[in-house]
């Protein structure tokens, strides 16, 4: 429910804890998957030959000066020189979150 989301979280100003609560809420409601939640929480997968490495990546709160909406818009607009299924998946996830955040902002 967008009205609930808009009343609980400000898309243009979220602390780290608020962002994590927001992402967890989306997962708990089935809006995003566990894998999508991990990605939004900053977990990234990098391949090196046959091995997979996971590492923490700064979230929109750290990069976007707490303006999650603007940072996710930026993420959704990226054009990768070497597109992969994973980078396109991340970009599409960002677009999905942008649409949620924009609707929240309209209802504030």
Model-derived segments and spans:
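Type III/flagellar secretion export determinants
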Residues: 1-108
């Amino acid at each position: 429910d967008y009205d609930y989301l808009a009343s609980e979280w400000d898309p243009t100003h979220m602390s780290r804890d608020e962002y994590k609560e927001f992402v967890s809420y989306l997962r708990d409601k089935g809006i995003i998957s566990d894998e999508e939640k991990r990605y939004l929480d900053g977990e990234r997968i990098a391949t090196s030959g046959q091995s997979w490495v996971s590492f923490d990546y700064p979230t929109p709160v750290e990069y976007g000066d707490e303006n999650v909406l603007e940072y996710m818009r930026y993420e959704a607009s990226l054009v990768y020189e070497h597109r992969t299924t994973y980078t396109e998946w991340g970009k599409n996830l960002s677009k999905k979150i942008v649409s949620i955040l924009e609707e929240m902002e309209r209802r504030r």
